């Protein structure tokens, strides 16, 4: 260890420190919002601190690797000589053992010419990935900023939230990415190019009114081809994921004329054909069903895919005008496959495409392990909800049971949740609910309808989500069947004990078939936790709206009525209100008061520092960072992940990098009141709003205002600290700990391959542990 410290001190020259600081400050300046004020110098320094952490941590890792493993190691044995061949201008020479395209080597040649490096040495080639890691943080920040801008309003659209910044830093520190920042592998550069392509895609869908031009389409093709030059499997992310998102963007921007409730046929047995025909026509004109993922159940997933698919098929020219670059990329890739005789370059015998469905089971524990700090708030929130609902009796003033909310309402609300009879929901492009004075509870039996039994069953199955336990059981049985019939153990997994996956398989999957089946529980729980984390958590506002029928308009949460286009939601879902008028008015007054206070606070925050104080983490006014992604986006992510993984017989953590990166970019922020920091303010507000109308909640609002005013006087640093999600900070610490552990194993725990008789193998070279 003393030798390692000496190496770090020797490489940390004054010029090196200045270079690192200059690069970090430059990157921080590039992230600054155009709305930042003259006081943004402090925020620039704090922004730079994240890049400083990445630079010096990665620089130290690179220096140690160059010292302890100066010669090419493992796959570097193929990559470094090939890059050196390109550096010498011999572009027609190719090592047939290399299976990936030459994108990494071309980037290296360009980088060496840019910085005027004469020779392509192992250390100089490895340094390419250090630069790429810094750029990953920068581009990831831009991508997350664009994602948040999709639900932002006003000044927030041009802002950079602290959550976006912290997320970008953590993505760059992701252990499987960061480890290869010190080695010459394709993964870091491939991730960077994919993020650039994704950033371009987000710019293309930034507006429904402004269509991307032809030159931008050509640029999209160039970026897509560049991504394919890094890895062949990137075609799924460029074509399926980004192309699918752009197709969905087009059909959601059609904006059909709204229809009245009187023109909407009721979904009853004798009218089922007319109802289906009506909704097929509505989907055809773009009235699609795409709720936020935290409001969607499996039936919503099916309706989402169906409605968007119908809309795309019925509007082919509009869709083609948007997605032609992705179709072009797919055509070019198909031409390459035909010319090459397959997807893989070089050694095709050990990389044969095989249907390997267990990959979609292995990925969930992988995600859960690395996302453990982010899952803690969700677990605690679920446990708290379970305890609360178990202890809290039904309010005495509630005269009608809410049939629109499922029995699993503590998990998430349903889009079939009851609305108030006196508060009209905002009009959307689909049917609008009529006054509930003409209806009772959800799908209540109608004595004038012969289909009341059908509606009652529909109520049980869809409104109360009676099918959900059967859905869970089906996923468990399907997982068990996949394990039993499709488990594949690639020879490389068992032949190389230098990879961590060797030991994971050895002590779990290879133990016995019983252990394999027992792991279904881990796969199921991990999948549920990851999905719930994608949903985010905004319980105070949503529970408040669901219980009282408060009007939810186009707020920062993005929860609005306009996404609902389901034939199963009728006027009967909007039952009589179950709360006193005075009590509802009291809640509205308190909500309005807190919102006004938060607006004033946000104005002050903007003036303090544009890049850091844009994220409002209050319980009643969630910022765009807390908005859950649309269901279509998550389903496309899941589809693309499946396509990119199930064709690979070999299980490698590196294959999970892009699925994890895109998942992490979609994860919404957790309100501070829902994080590990404190939930006192949220609890006080939630409890005050559920009082029986006596106005006791005003004390909580006053206390919160006094606390906020006091905190605002402590300056930028305190503002950042109190707005920082502790789970996000814990994720940073978690990644640093994992990185230090894997660095230690690679550098200081080498071993030799020996036969049973003690004879050295592999020429007596040191072997090292790695991902």
Curated annotation (Swiss-Prot):
Catalytic reaction annotation: an alpha-D-Glc-(1->3)-alpha-D-Glc-(1->3)-alpha-D-Man-(1->2)-alpha-D-Man-(1->2)-alpha-D-Man-(1->3)-[alpha-D-Man-(1->2)-alpha-D-Man-(1->3)-[alpha-D-Man-(1->2)-alpha-D-Man-(1->6)]-alpha-D-Man-(1->6)]-beta-D-Man-(1->4)-beta-D-GlcNAc-(1->4)-alpha-D-GlcNAc-diphospho-di-trans,poly-cis-dolichol + a di-trans,poly-cis-dolichyl beta-D-glucosyl phosphate = a alpha-D-Glc-(1->2)-alpha-D-Glc-(1->3)-alpha-D-Glc-(1->3)-alpha-D-Man-(1->2)-alpha-D-Man-(1->2)-alpha-D-Man-(1->3)-[alpha-D-Man-(1->2)-alpha-D-Man-(1->3)-[alpha-D-Man-(1->2)-alpha-D-Man-(1->6)]-alpha-D-Man-(1->6)]-beta-D-Man-(1->4)-beta-D-GlcNAc-(1->4)-alpha-D-GlcNAc-diphospho-di-trans,poly-cis-dolichol + a di-trans,poly-cis-dolichyl phosphate + H(+)
Top enzyme class: transferase
UniProt-listed Pfam families: DIE2_ALG10
PANTHER family documented for this protein: ALPHA-1,2-GLUCOSYLTRANSFERASE ALG10, DOL-P-GLC:GLC(2)MAN(9)GLCNAC(2)-PP-DOL ALPHA-1,2-GLUCOSYLTRANSFERASE-RELATED
Primary residence: endoplasmic reticulum
Gene Ontology biological-process entries: dolichol-linked oligosaccharide biosynthetic process; protein N-linked glycosylation
Pathway participation: Protein modification; protein glycosylation
Region feature (Disordered): 392-449, 584-605, 682-708
Glycosylation sites: 448
Record-given protein name: Dol-P-Glc:Glc(2)Man(9)GlcNAc(2)-PP-Dol alpha-1,2-glucosyltransferase
Keywords: Endoplasmic reticulum, Glycoprotein, Glycosyltransferase, Membrane, Transferase, Transmembrane, Transmembrane helix
């Amino acid at each position: 260890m003393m030798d390692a410290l000496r190496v770090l001190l020797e490489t940390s020259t004054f010029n090196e420190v200045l270079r690192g600081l200059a690069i970090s400050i430059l990157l921080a300046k590039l992230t600054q919002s155009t709305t930042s004020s003259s006081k943004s110098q402090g925020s620039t320094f704090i922004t730079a601190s994240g890049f400083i952490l990445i630079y010096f941590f990665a620089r130290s890792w690179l220096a140690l690797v160059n010292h302890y493993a100066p010669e090419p190691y493992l796959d570097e044995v193929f990559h470094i000589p090939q890059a050196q061949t390109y550096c010498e201008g011999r572009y027609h020479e190719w090592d047939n053992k290399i299976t990936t395209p030459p994108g990494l080597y071309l980037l290296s040649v360009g980088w060496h010419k840019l910085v005027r490096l004469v020779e392509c040495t192992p250390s100089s080639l490895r340094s390419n990935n250090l630069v790429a890691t810094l750029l990953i943080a920068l581009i990831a920040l831009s991508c997350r900023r664009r994602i948040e801008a999709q639900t932002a309003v006003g000044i927030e659209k041009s802002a950079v939230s602290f959550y976006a910044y912290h997320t970008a830093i953590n993505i760059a520190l992701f252990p499987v990415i960061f480890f290869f920042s010190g080695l010459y592998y394709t993964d870091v550069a491939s991730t960077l190019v994919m993020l650039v392509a994704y950033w371009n895609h987000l710019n293309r869908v930034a507006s429904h009114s402004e269509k991307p031009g032809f030159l931008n389409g050509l640029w999209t093709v160039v970026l897509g081809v560049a991504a394919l030059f890094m890895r062949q499997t990137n075609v799924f992310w460029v074509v399926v994921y980004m192309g699918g998102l752009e197709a969905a963007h087009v059909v959601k921007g059609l904006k059909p004329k709204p229809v009245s409730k009187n023109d909407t046929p009721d979904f009853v047995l004798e009218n089922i054909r007319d109802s289906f025909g009506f909704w097929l026509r509505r989907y055809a004109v773009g009235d699609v069903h795409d709720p936020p993922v935290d409001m969607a159940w499996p039936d919503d997933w099916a309706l989402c895919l169906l409605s968007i698919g119908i809309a795309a098929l019925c509007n082919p020219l509009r869709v083609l005008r948007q997605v032609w670059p992705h179709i072009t990329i797919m055509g070019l890739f198909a031409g390459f496959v035909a010319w090459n005789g397959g997807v893989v370059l070089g050694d095709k015998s050990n990389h044969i495409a095989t249907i390997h469905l267990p990959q979609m089971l292995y990925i969930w524990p992988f995600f859960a392990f690395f996302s453990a700090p982010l899952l803690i708030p969700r677990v605690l929130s679920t446990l708290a909800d379970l305890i609360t609902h178990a202890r809290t009796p039904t309010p005495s003033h509630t005269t009608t049971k809410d049939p629109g909310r499922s029995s699993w309402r503590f998990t998430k609300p349903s889009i079939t949740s009851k609305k108030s009879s006196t508060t009209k929901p905002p009009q959307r492009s689909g049917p609008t609910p009529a006054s509930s004075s003409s209806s009772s509870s959800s799908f209540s039996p109608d004595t004038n309808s012969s289909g009341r039994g059908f509606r009652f069953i529909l109520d049980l199955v869809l409104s109360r989500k009676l099918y959900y336990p059967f859905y869970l059981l089906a996923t468990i049985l399907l997982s068990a069947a996949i394990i039993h019939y499709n488990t594949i153990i690639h020879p490389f997994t068992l032949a190389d004990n230098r990879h961590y996956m060797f030991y994971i398989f050895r002590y779990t999957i290879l133990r016995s078939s019983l252990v394999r089946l027992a792991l279904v529980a881990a796969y199921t729980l991990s999948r549920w936790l990851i999905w719930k984390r994608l949903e985010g958590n905004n319980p105070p506002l949503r529970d408040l709206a669901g219980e009282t029928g408060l009007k939810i308009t186009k707020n920062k949460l993005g929860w609005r009525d306009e996404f609902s286009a389901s034939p199963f939601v009728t006027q009967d879902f909007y039952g009589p209100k179950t709360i006193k008028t005075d009590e509802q008015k009291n809640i509205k007054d308190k909500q309005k008061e807190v919102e006004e206070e938060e607006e004033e606070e946000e104005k002050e925050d903007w003036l303090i520092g544009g890049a850091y104080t844009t994220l409002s983490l209050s319980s009643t006014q969630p910022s765009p960072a807390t908005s859950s992604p649309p269901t279509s986006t998550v389903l496309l992510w899941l589809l693309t992940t499946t396509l990119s993984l199930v064709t690979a017989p070999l299980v490698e953590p590196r294959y999970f990098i892009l699925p994890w990166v895109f998942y992490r970019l979609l994860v919404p922020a957790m309100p501070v009141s829902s994080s590990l920091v404190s939930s006192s303010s949220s609890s006080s507000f939630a409890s005050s709003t559920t009082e029986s109308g006596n106005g006791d909640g005003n004390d909580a609002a006053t206390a919160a205002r006094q606390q906020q005013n006091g905190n605002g006087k402590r300056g930028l640093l305190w503002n950042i600290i109190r707005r920082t999600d502790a789970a996000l900070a814990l994720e940073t610490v978690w990644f640093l700990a994992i990185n230090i552990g894997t660095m230690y194993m690679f550098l200081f725990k080498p071993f030799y391959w020996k036969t049973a008789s003690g004879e050295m193998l592999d020429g007596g070279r040191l072997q090292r542990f790695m991902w």
